[in-house]
Amino acid sequence: MKISVQNFGIISDAAVEIKGISLIAGPNDSGKSTIGKIFYSLIRGLNPDEDIFISEKNDSIRRFYQNILKILRDNKDIDISIYQTSRINDEWISKIESLAENFVGTQKKQLIRYCKFIKYQNDLEFNSIENKNFEIDDYFLIEFNDDIQPIFNEEKITSIFIEDLEGTATLQYNFNSELNKNINIFFNNSFFIESPSLIDKSLQDSILYEKRFSRDKKSHLKFALANESNFILDDENQINEIDKIIKIISEIINGRIVVDDFQGVLYEKNGQEINIDNVALGIKGFGLIQLLLKNHQLNSRTLLIIDEPEIHLHPNWQVLYAEILVLISKKLEIPILLTSHSPYFIEALKVFSEKYEYEENLFKSINPIPWCSQSIQPLNHFLFLL
């Protein structure tokens, strides 16, 4: 999958392709994290959940239906029982539209507007371009809080060109997303790791109470850390490779992170159970990857996005973390998008990519004029970028 982004917040233009391990390197406030959030929003927005779609659609129709009945109750001349129904179809909508002609002012306008909303929701299809636009809008709102318009030139149009094995499409954004065509993409899921600090006692709640689906990236990740995937892995070679990498991680951190509905969230080290609140973030960083692998949450169609993993890692562990990621991506065919400004981490990725004969993919944040917006472009080799 490749995206070309123009005039998105701080970013003037960027072209980033997911290929094995892709690394965006550059200083803080250069748009690195923005690209990761765009990928996350697009992948999840273009893969809506059908059960959630049906539930939210029915909730929306029910809400407008109740608003209509509330208006009708205010008119004592109307027998409301005639209009109460469990089948809100075109025939029922036509009755309400005809009845609205007997109203005046605000109530008439509201009845007509509510009927239009219900009709639109009734006609909305799960895999339609309209629904995908709504989904992308929801993710953009969560991730960017509407801070999407170009910062340095508000007159320019925000656009994203999406290129995938399944086809191409252009998304333009002007306070709402507008795809020029309905596109299905290869990736069907994504996880975004910002900080390992979310590994805490609340992970137990993700087993007992957390909803299976959430648009919030932290809740989405926490559910995956606490629950096994529905993805059925029957490839013995893959299972063996996963077990090997989990074992390597266990050796690095001298133990493992356990999430259990009875025991809670623990760090097991040399047979001892340690309160997760007393565990270093570096250990949690490795444990997070360990849990995703154990729960079979990662596969070739799931993009793993990790934002500046070096922040909570000692330089020596940055090197080991880089090796783990290269092994995961090569041995398990897991696509990974990374951002970093650490020379230790960047160089380690280069070294281990060469050691394991694995392709790396580097992009650099470029800002020739300090007060202008950022450009992110591909490089053919690794550089220290601090």
PLM region spans:
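Switch/communication elements of ASCE P-loop NTPase nucleotide-binding domains
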Residues: 1-49, 266-386
